[in-house]
Amino acid sequence: MRSLKLILASASVVSATCPYMSGEMPNSQNGPLDRRHDTLSDPTDQFLSKFYIDDEQSVLTTDVGGPIEDQHSLKAGNRGPTLLEDFIFRQKIQHFDHERVPERAVHARGAGAHGVFTSYNNWSNITAASFLNAAGKQTPVFVRFSTVAGSRGSVDSARDIHGFATRLYTDEGNFDIVGNNVPVFFIQDAIQFPDLIHAVKPQPDSEIPQAATAHDTAWDFFSQQPSSLHALFWAMSGHGIPRSMRHVDGWGVHTFRLVTDEGNSTLVKFRWKTLQGRAGLVWEEAQALGGKNPDFHRQDLWDAIESGRYPEWELGFQLVNEADQSKFDFDLLDPTKIIPEELVPFTPIGKMVLNRNPKNYFAETEQIMFQPGHVVRGIDFTDDPLLQGRLYSYLDTQLNRHGGPNFEQLPINRPRIPFHNNNRDGAGQMFIPLNTAAYTPNSMSNGFPQQANRTHNRGFFTAPGRMVNGPLVRELSPSFNDVWSQPRLFYNSLTVFEKQFLVNAMRFENSHVRSETVRKNVIIQLNRVDNDLARRVALAIGVEPPSPDPTFYHNKTTVPIGTFGTNLLRLDGLKIALLTRDDGSFTIAEQLRAAFNSANNKVDIVLVGSSLDPQRGVNMTYSGADGSIFDAVIVVGGLLTSASTQYPRGRPLRIITDAYAYGKPVGAVGDGSNEALRDVLMAAGGDASNGLDQPGVYISNDVSEAYVRSVLDGLTAYRFLNRFPLDR
C-alpha cells in the first residue's frame, strides 16, 4: 500500500465634535490603495477571519479531511465502469449538484461591500440607539446594492428601482435599513406585494422580458393601481438607470420611530445621501452597457474600492414630532409619499464609507439576509401597512433560501456581539448549546439567559406612547387616497430635459404594450398627473390625446430631485478614454495621461489602441472599447480611419460619436483635431455650421494645464443636455 504524508489543512485566523457645529464638512480620508490593510476594516476582518479557509501550502482533501491523490474517478480497469464505492467522486458531484440556493424572489441581482459608519455627534437626545451615542463612534457596515425585477443573471443597467440595503453591526445588535434608491414604493399595503411582483416579472407564458417592465402585465398593474405612479415616475427618470451604485442615494422608504432612553419618541425617515453626487445614464447608453458589460455597476463598485477610492454617503434624518404628523396634506404612514425637503430638512447624522470588498461573493453578498425587523434599542416601527407586512415577509423568505431557521448563524449574518436565547436545533445548526434548560422561566439554569428590560441590560422597548384602537377593517385610511399630487410634484421638479427623458422612457415602455386597453388606461392615469405628459406619450403609442383632468394639478415644486443638471461632487473612478493611432500619437497620449494624473489622480485614464501594448500604456483595444463605458472620450492625433481586422469597421469614430450622443465630454488633441470632431458632429447629427466651440467639446493643438482643467470641468458637469432634442 502506498503511504501518503498527511498534512492537515486548517483554517487560518487572521488575525470628536460634530463637524456641523463649526460649519465644516468632514474631510474624506481615503486609505492606502490596498484596502485589505485599511485600519477601518479591522473589526470586520477580526470577526470574519475566524471563518476564513486559507489553502496556501495545503493538501487537497475531501470534506472530511482525507487527502486526495488523484483527480480521476475509480474504475474497474482503465476503460471500465466507474464504481459506486468511489466516495470521493460521490461527495464532489453531490456537493456540486447542490451548490446553488434559490435566488431571492426580488433583488436577486446584487453586489455588496463592507465599510464603516461614523456618527457625527452624540444623538442620545433623539434616540437610545447606542451606535449614535458618541461623536466619532464607528460601527461596521455591509451594504448590498441590487436591481429588483431581474434574475441573478440579468444586466446591471436594466431600468429598475435599485435596492440599497444597509446592515450596521452595532454593539447592541444588528440594525438593517432595508431601502431603495428612491424614497417611495409602488403599493401602500403589503398584501399587494405578490400582485406587484407577478405583474412586473416576465410574462408567465414566455418568460419574456427579463429585467424589464416594458410589457403588458406591468403597465396593466400600474394603470389599475395608481398608487404605483409616484415610484413609477422615479423609475422612468434617471434614477431607474443610475451611472453607478456610487452615484445613488439610499432611502428607508418608511416612516420609523426614534425612541430615547426616557421613552420620548420622534417620527423619522432615513436617507443615505451620496457624497459623489447623483448621476444617471441615458437610455441608449444603458442598453449598450447591457451588452458591452452586463456587470458594469458591480465592476465599478469593486474597482473603486480596490483602488482606494472609497465611496461615501451621509446619513440624514427627517424628524417629525409625533404631535405634528397630521399637519401635512399627506399621511406619513403612506410609503408612496415623500416629505418634501423644504418642509422638513434632513439633519446630518453621520457618514458611511465603503472600504472593503467581499472575499467571497456567495458567503457574504449572496448569503446576507436583510430584514426590516432587525432593529435595536432606540429604533421602533410605525403602523405603515407596507412596513408591517415586510416585517414578516423578509424573515419568512429566508426559510426557502437557506432550508432552515439557522440562517442568522451564517458568519455574514451574525451580530458582532454574543447572543443568547432558547432557540434550538434545526437544519444547519452551527453551535453546541450547553444550557440544558432551554426555556424561560427556569430554575435549573438559575434563570439564565435572563430577560432584559428597559432599565436592566438595556432591553429593547416599544415607544411607550404607542396605542392601537378601532374596529377590525380591511381598508386603507382615506388619508392615503391622493396618489396623483406627489407624482406631479416630482414631475414639476425635473428639468426640461429630465422631463423629456421621462416622456421618452414611457413612450418606449408602452410601445411594447400590445393591449390597446392597457395603453388607454395608462394615458388616463398619466393625465391625472399632467396633461402635457399624457398627450406627448399618447401621440407616440397610438392613443387619442386626452383633455385635461385637473383635479390634482398644481404648480408646486420641491428641491432638485433628478439625476441630471447638477454638478458631480467628486470625479473618483470616472474614466477618460484616449483614442490613439498606431504612430506618434502615443507621445501625446502619455503627456495627456500624466497631465490628468497630476490634476486629479482619482480619474482613470484609459489608452485605447489597435492592440494591447503595455510598453506604450495601451490597456484597452478598439475591439473591446465602447462609448458607453467611458465618461469622456478624447481623440489623440486624429481619428484612426483605416480598415482593420482587429476591430469592427468604423469603431474608433463610433466610440466618440456615441459618447457625444450620450451627452458626454469629447475632445481632440494634436494634428487632425478639427477634422476629427467635425466628423463626430456630422455622424452624431450635431451642428458644426457655427464651428466646434460648443459646451462639452474640447480642442487643442497641444497638451496644456488649461485644456486638462477644462475637460475635468466638463466631467464635473457630467452631461451636456443641450445635445438632446426636445418635443416642440
From Swiss-Prot:
Organism annotation: Ajellomyces capsulatus
Name under which the protein is recorded: Catalase B
Active-site feature positions: 107, 180
Principal subcellular localization: secreted
CDD domains membership: GATase1_catalase
Listed PROSITE patterns: CATALASE_2, CATALASE_3
Gene symbol of the encoding locus: CATB
Source lineage: Eukaryota, Fungi, Dikarya, Ascomycota, Pezizomycotina
Keywords attached to this entry: Heme, Hydrogen peroxide, Iron, Metal-binding, Oxidoreductase, Peroxidase, Secreted
The protein's required cofactors: heme
